[in-house]
Regions:
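Short cytosolic juxtamembrane segments of multi-pass membrane proteins
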Residues: 3-8, 181-195, 574-575, 665-673
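Short helix-loop junctions at transmembrane helix boundaries
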Residues: 40-51, 55, 124-156, 213-231, ...
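N-terminal Sec/SRP start-transfer signal
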Residues: 1-32, 197-202, 211, 247-295, ...
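Basic-flanked hydrophobic alpha-helices used for secretion and membrane insertion
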Residues: 315-329, 335-559
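Hydrophobic alpha-helical transmembrane segments of multi-pass inner-membrane transport and secretion
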Residues: 19-46, 55-92, 112-126, 206, ...
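Hydrophobic alpha-helical segments
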Residues: 114-258
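Juxtamembrane interface at the cytosolic side of transmembrane helices
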Residues: 78, 86, 178, 224, ...
Length: 673
């Protein structure tokens, strides 16, 4: 066969199937452009000049490149499999007319090659052309001001070509197996396979319900941030499995139940819609579940990153309680704490800064094992101790507690304490080791007051530092070199602009270093110094990077969702065309056909977005606690961001549904619109 004929056939096939190939190539270009942009930004030399947070931003961008690369594989394989299914009849005709499968393989190879060149080449051109604009957006989000020099990332270009060339090669191998293993008759009927009525898979439906319920239960009942972080991915996997199983098995069971209801089923619009969905539900369900999962990812990623960025000031206020923070771990807290305070105050005065607010706090924190309501001081590796039984006991003086948390604590007599927990402590006394303390008052620690607390931490308020001494000695005797020391924290707000506050903080750090106090880190004491104004840039850059990545990934997931919806509408249209033509021949009018179509596509395409919204609402408590680990305790802000994201995404989803429905109508009937 003339070698030039293969190329002509490949080009003509792409042109003939442009309705399928154009969206495929366009989204392929965008995916390539996204991937290159992430690599370009990650290797941008300008980021190396960031005064703070360069590693954080580069880590976020590197993570984004990995995520985009991973989903590119899934996305391109999905769209390729759809196109191949629609084209099996065409390839079967070629086979019957005399083309051998090796000839078909050459044509498919050239089609894949041309598609790869178009997608990779077009994507790289777009990525390079808009790279400077993307860099400007990133710099704006992280609050970085620097000159942006246009350049092409050679390593980014090479990595992009290698990845996507590999993906397209894998799709070619997949297509080759599809052709080689199929008989000519199977190719002719390949695009209409899957019409057998699926069986009701009760076990799959039950497993789906159980896994989804388990995922929801974890998300809703999680009671502390640490557990939320540990169980998040477990809950996600359970929800994904449950979603797919319920869509694939539960939906069929529901449709068959509706078919048994004669009063519902034997109506024109219900009869056609329900019977049509039953015969193709296995195929539909996988696509609809994918749309649901992708929609959920869009909602979670965008709402979380937007709320993190919008709540940056709250997060900084929770993380840094003063412009300058100095803490010391010591065995002699009063003497060394007073010396540290005096040195810091003197240095601030030397820098000509005024102290606006000053707060000092002394605490002693050590771990215990909860046994029958008592706290036992014992090493955790002893037999019988479990992580769920570990309680972190934090002792604090009454005066410091009132000042730090803006609460009122009643006067305490000898050995009396106030116990603050986030769970229900029922006893009127608390026993720690060999010491029992009467509880004058119990308080609940609420997350709504701007501070989040793990329910495995107890705050025990005492009169003075001297009241901490017995338990300090007790835990020191048990834990030895691993025992806790007193922890003195000093937070000071000063006047001045950002640069003056940074300079003052650096002066405090230098003064402490020159005093020789830091040399006590051999176990006697250890000093840590924090400068809020200086660290604010690092946080802003990291969270700005997360926001940029969230928007980028949100657009990518949305694009994949739109393409799946588009291909599904086309697939549904071609599969329904003959069926509705038969209905028209037996007496159904165009108007009745249109109503039937509307009922079917509404049922099919509104289900994923409704389910996605339910997933996100169920995940709200868990995501909120995970954000609390990052000091975002403003639940109302996250709720507003989540509701806003759901609203905007729903509008976009409905617009896409409306536009793709027109394509469906045009395929099914010329007069339906």
């Amino acid at each position: 066969m003339n070698r030039g004929l293969y190329g002509k056939l490949a080009v003509n096939n792409i042109k003939h199937n442009r309705q399928f190939y154009l969206p495929y190539l366009l989204t392929g270009m965008l995916t390539v452009a996204f991937f290159y942009t992430m690599l370009y930004l990650n290797h941008n030399p300008g980021l190396d000049e960031l005064p703070f947070g360069a590693m954080d931003v580069e880590l976020v961008l590197g993570l984004g490149a990995v995520i985009i690369g991973f989903f590119s594989v899934i996305f391109l394989f999905y769209t390729n499999s759809f196109i191949m299914k629609r084209r099996k009849k065409e390839l079967g005709i070629y086979n019957i007319l005399g083309m051998e499968k090796r000839h078909l393989a050459k044509v498919i190879f050239l089609e894949t090659f041309f598609s790869a060149v178009g997608a990779i080449g077009g994507g790289l051109v777009a990525g390079i052309a808009f790279s400077k604009l993307m860099c400007m957006l990133l710099y704006a989000m992280i609050g970085y001001h620097a000159e942006i020099v246009f350049y092409v990332s050679e390593s980014g270009v090479v990595s992009t070509i290698l990845l996507f060339a590999g993906i397209f090669m894998l799709t070619f191998i997949y297509n080759l197996f599809q052709i080689q293993l199929a008989k000519p008759v199977e190719l002719l009927h390949g695009s209409s396979q899957g019409e057998r009525e699926p069986k009701t898979k009760k076990l799959m439906a039950i497993v789906g319900i159980v896994t989804l319920a388990a995922g929801y239960y974890m998300a809703i009942t999680v009671d502390n941030p640490v557990t939320a972080v540990l169980l998040f991915f477990v809950a996600v996997i359970l929800v994904i499995i449950g979603t797919y199983f319920i869509f694939m098995a539960g939906s069929i069971a529901v449709l068959k139940f509706l078919r048994k209801r004669k009063s519902y089923y034997y109506k024109k619009k219900h009869f056609v819609a329900v019977s049509g969905l039953i015969y193709r539900m296995k195929q539909n369900a996988a696509g609809l579940a994918s749309i649901c999962i992708l929609s959920t990812m869009v909602l979670v990623v965008i709402s979380s990153t937007v709320s993190m960025y919008a709540g940056l000031d709250d997060e900084l206020a929770a993380r840094y309680q003063g412009d300058i923070g100095v803490s010391i771990t010591s065995e002699n807290p009063i003497t060394e704490g007073d010396a540290l305070r005096e040195l810091v105050n003197r240095t601030i005065q030397q820098e000509n800064r005024s102290i606006k607010d000053e707060q000092g706090m002394m605490t002693l924190t050590f771990s215990c094992i909860s046994e029958d309501g008592n706290l036992v001081i014992r090493k955790h590796d002893d037999e019988g101790s479990y992580s769920s039984d570990i309680i972190m006991l934090r002792m604090i003086t009454r005066e410091d507690y009132e000042e730090a948390y803006n609460v009122t604590v009643p006067e305490l007599s000898d050995h009396e304490v106030v116990l603050t927990t986030s769970d229900d402590y029922e006893k009127d006394t608390i026993t720690v080791g060999d010491y029992t303390y009467p509880i004058l008052q119990k308080q609940h620690f609420s997350s709504e007051n701007g501070h989040w607390m793990d329910n495995q931490v107890y705050y025990m308020v005492v009169n003075s530092v001297e009241d901490m001494a017995p338990l300090y000695e007790a835990q020191k005797e048990i834990y030895g070199k691993n025992a806790s020391s007193y922890y003195y924290s000093l937070y000071i707000d000063i006047d001045g602009n950002r640069e003056e506050k940074i300079a003052c903080g650096n002066a405090v750090s230098a003064a402490i270093g020159a005093s020789g106090m830091e040399e006590g880190h051999d176990g006697k004491y250890y000093i840590m110094i924090e400068n809020r104004a200086e660290n604010e840039d690092s946080f802003r850059q990291m969270y700005g990077g997360f926001l940029f990545l969230g928007i980028f990934l949100g657009i990518l997931f949305l694009m994949i969702t739109v393409l799946i919806i588009f291909y599904k509408q086309i697939s549904e249209g071609y599969e329904d065309k003959e069926r509705f033509a038969i209905m028209e021949k037996v007496g159904m009018s165009n108007e009745e056909v249109k109503k039937t179509i509307s009922a079917q596509i509404r049922m099919v395409f509104l289900l994923p977005i409704v389910t996605a919204a339910l997933h996100v609402l169920a995940a709200f408590p868990m995501i909120r606690m995970i954000l609390a680990v990052m000091n975002l305790n403003n639940g109302r802000l996250f709720a507003y961001c989540l509701l806003g994201t759901i609203t905007v995404f729903t509008v976009i989803y409905l617009l896409v549904y409306k536009m793709t429905s027109r394509t469906y109508y045009r395929i099914v009937g010329r007069q339906i619109g």
